[in-house]
Amino acid sequence: MAEEKALNDQMLARRQKLATIVSDLHLDPFGKRFERTAKAQELHNLYDASSLEELENAKHEVVIAGRMVAKRGAGKVIFADFRDVSGKIQVYARRDDLADNYPIIKRADLGDFLGIKGIMMKTEAGELTVLATELTHLSKALRPMPDKFHGISDVETRYRKRYLDLIANEDSFKKFQERSHIISAIRAYMDRNDFLEVETPILQTEAGGAAARPFITHHNALNIDMYMRIATELYLKRLVVGGMERVYEIGRIFRNEGMDPKHNPEFTTMESYAAYMDFTDVMDETEGIFKAAASVVSDDLKITYQGTEIDLGTKFARKHLVDLIKEQTGIDFWQEMSVEEAQKLADDNHVKYEKYWGVGHIINAFFEEFVEDTLVQPTFVYGHPVEVSPLAKKNTDDPRFTDRFELFIMGSEYANAFTELNDPIDQRARFEAQAAERENGNDEAEGIDEDFIEALEYGMPPTGGLGVGIDRLVMLLTDSDTIRDVVLFPTMRPE
């Protein structure tokens, strides 16, 4: 209660100051357009190397704007720190220089926005500073800033009120800047390689392209239920059928599933499809994307994630899923076996399975149980069973497996790709098998998308497809241990 009263007292004091800005200073407390000549970091880049005497002689005039985050002094002289999107800069305000303008900064609270015109200088201590010659009040903050800018300790507040997190935590602010730059780097890589960026529907009549539970909504005008997309895959492939040989989309995906440190119900992916490529070509593409993204945060492409060094600059390893299982368990799934034999192996090794599973499902479960966590450095794992790859092309040498790969780093999957299934007859059979799984209790199995099958019947060239989880990639590159730290507004339970 005492803390709440103190907050209320501070808010009351700020509202009283708001009134005096109007009554005494005759200013609009919420300002108007303001034109600046430089940002804080630009000033540091230009003048940090200059001496006190050089700046004193040059008298460089600048105009800046930002939020006041620190204030020292209250009489005839005030030092204050102002932050903009690029960083912080100190301002030195003297009553004798500013005259009637001086009350603007004297009455300003932490969090207020001011515009400052001034001359570049350095203090005796060597700190780069703007000597204010004119002040403009731009906006009044009616609530006190969190924790005096020392951060927000309550993680719930950080996620629910991200604006406070961005104000208080410079590391968090920087992380989201890096996220934007990472996405830009991926876009630039795709554009350089002749991929066309496209947009596909978020509202769909069939939920396909992934094994996931969709969000369902209702379209009033059409009086039909629709699904929030769980993948962009099937529409992007339609575009390849239509002659767009290289396409990609960066966009939001929605899955009505659980939340944990690596999963949020809405998340961002990048999917791409390229005609006349196969999954080995897509490995090269994926490696290029990850190297481009890593260059945003590391010049040598080496990063540290949760204390472990990851080298994204080296050639990524390529290993078959069955070989990896054999390395870890001694079990050879290259041998053909019945479902009963696979179930016995699972029972003997304490691997759980569902009653509707085939041999391929059990092989995949062995991989998840015994191999995933061992894959620390970037590794392409290829050759997934047909049963868990309904949209991937069968391997010609062993049709039990597919020309599919996943990229693993630090025991987690970061990309999923395959040589796309372009045989409409085989695709229908796969969809029907998925529908049967749904009947047997797998509520994440896909249904039959008749329109997509029709599109394939018009002919789709051999195609390599890729999906990358952007949020998980940003987690890796910014050393974040939860997806909520890299999604600006994560899904939260209502308070």
From Swiss-Prot:
The keyword Membrane does not apply. Its cofactor is Mg(2+). One of its GO terms (molecular function) is ATP binding. SUPFAM superfamilies: Class II aaRS and biotin synthetases, Nucleic acid-binding proteins. GO terms for cellular component: cytosol. GO terms for biological process: lysyl-tRNA aminoacylation. This is Lysine--tRNA ligase. The gene is lysS.
